[in-house]
Amino acid sequence: MREKYQVLVLPYRYIGSEIQYALLKRQDMGVWQGIAGGGEDFDKTPLASAKREAKEEMNIDESSTYIVLDSIASIPSYHFKNHQELWGKETYVIPEYCFGVNVKEDILQLSDEHTEYKWCSYDDANKLLEWDSNRVALWELNERLKNDIC
């Protein structure tokens, strides 16, 4: 069963000293975002959900290094199918927990939920992202990586 939270995972890699971020283009909405998905009742923690979603959506190895970000957004529940049946009429927002993941793979496999992905600089990624919550998490991750505070 779908749990009452969302996860956002921002894949990143180093090319020399440059940091690049992978963005995915959603098949259903045509917008750019990080890896996003919901917690399931079998996930023990939001980090476990993040690892599962990253594996499902981009085939990122679960042993990859994850950074737990301080950024937490509130997502209106109406964005989720059957939200009232899942969580009741009194649930108006759910939290979105954010993570970065260091990707070693050169080529990532996309799930059917996305049409393409691209590696971007921070500035390019910031311009492409659709959602403010993604931009805030990207900013935090970029600052942590630039300042080596992970």
What is the role of each PLM region?
Residues 1-21, 42:
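Conserved N-terminal beta-strand and adjoining loop/helix that marks the start
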Residues 18-63:
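Conserved Nudix-box catalytic region and its N-terminal flanking loop in Nudix hydrolases
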Residues 59-106:
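Active-site segment of metal-dependent pyrophosphate-handling enzymes
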Residues 143-150:
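Generic C-terminal helix-cap and adjacent flexible tail
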